[in-house]
């Protein structure tokens, strides 16, 4: 179910916060491919670097908005990381993410932005949740402790958008994607997510002929992985088509219409089977050990994406296809020493 008229225009000034990151870079490329940001159509894609705009500085962000006057804003900027990084640096994860999103959302509201999209994460949902996870399950139970700080920040951003929409009719909404991966990911073993960490670990073991390697946990947890280009497609699709006033969505316990939807691939895999896939992809033939003294994180996180399906969106990239593309990009950057680490 989509609107007949697109809700964003080729002539819009579109600000992508975090345009150099995994999601932002894919999103910027797709916006341009679809015809946005072209001078002959009076549009522009605004994608300042960290040096050009410190998103944690509220005064700097407010001044940038007054000078550049964006019509559409996508918040793809965030401090992200895996279990190790989240567990060791909860203060940094909470403070930095709160600053980034609060500064952008408030300046968007102050300066007449017409449409704002905030990107969250599936980690906002309770650790012990009914599966698949519906949007209305938010705050029904306690969070996973290993990434609680990041989750709290994302919940705050989601709720700020919801309250601004409800109280001031500000057109802000959110998408909650499942576990992301793709070209341009972070491969630092100390702060990366599980999939890129496994790619790096297995590739290194393969080229150095290691006889065995060790992965964290039991390998039993299930994960739903979403290729980053599919999320970029979902972002633009939602910006163009999600008419909040016309489309019907579930309500919370107070009968308020929800202002976020889940985005996922509907494809689940255990970490054990993911490791086997990546071992095959990287030509690793040694033994895979599992260190069960390390945390698994949430056992299962499968999102219910029926609302996205209702809007007319679905993912296009299978896990096997996405892994192949991601590894090819990894090899290209590994050989030229351009990996994000």
Task: Identify the meaning behind each predicted range.
Residues 6, 11, 22, 26-30, ...:
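C-terminal substrate-binding subdomain of Rossmann-fold SDR/epimerase-dehydratase oxidoreductases
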């Amino acid at each position: 179910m989509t609107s007949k008229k697109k809700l964003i225009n080729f002539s819009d000034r579109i600000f992508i916060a975090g345009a150099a990151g995994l999601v932002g870079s894919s999103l910027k490329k797709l916006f341009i491919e679809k015809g946005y940001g072209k001078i002959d159509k009076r549009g522009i894609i605004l994608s300042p670097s960290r040096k050009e705009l410190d998103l944690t500085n509220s005064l700097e962000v407010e001044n940038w908005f007054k000078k550049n006057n964006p019509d559409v804003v996508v918040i793809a900027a965030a401090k992200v990381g895996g279990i190790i990084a989240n567990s060791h640096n909860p203060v940094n994860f909470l403070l930095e993410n709160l600053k980034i999103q609060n500064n952008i959302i408030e300046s968007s509201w102050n300066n007449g932005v017409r449409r704002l999209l905030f990107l969250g994460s599936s980690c906002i949902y309770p650790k012990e949740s009914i599966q698949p996870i519906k949007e209305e399950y938010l705050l029904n139970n306690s969070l996973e402790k290993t990434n609680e700080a990041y989750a709290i920040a994302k919940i705050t951003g989601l709720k700020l958008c919801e309250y601004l929409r409800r109280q001031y009719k500000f057109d802000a909404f959110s998408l909650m994607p499942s576990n992301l991966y793709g070209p341009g990911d972070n491969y630092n073993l100390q702060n990366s997510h599980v999939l890129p960490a496994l790619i790096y670990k297995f590739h290194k073991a393969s080229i150095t002929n290691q006889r065995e390697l060790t992965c964290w946990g039991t390998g039993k947890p299930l994960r739903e992985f979403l290729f980053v280009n599919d999320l970029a497609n979902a972002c633009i699709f939602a910006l163009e088509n999600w008419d909040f006033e016309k489309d019907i969505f579930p309500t919370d316990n107070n009968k308020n219409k929800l202002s976020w939807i889940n985005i996922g691939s509907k494809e689940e895999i255990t970490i054990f089977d993911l490791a086997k896939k990546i071992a095959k992809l990287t030509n690793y033939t040694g033994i895979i050990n599992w260190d069960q003294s390390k945390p698994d994180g949430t056992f299962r996180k499968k999102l219910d994406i029926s609302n996205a399906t209702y809007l007319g969106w679905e993912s296009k990239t299978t896990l096997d296809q996405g892994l192949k593309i991601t590894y090819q990009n990894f090899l290209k950057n590994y050989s030229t020493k351009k990996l994000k680490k």
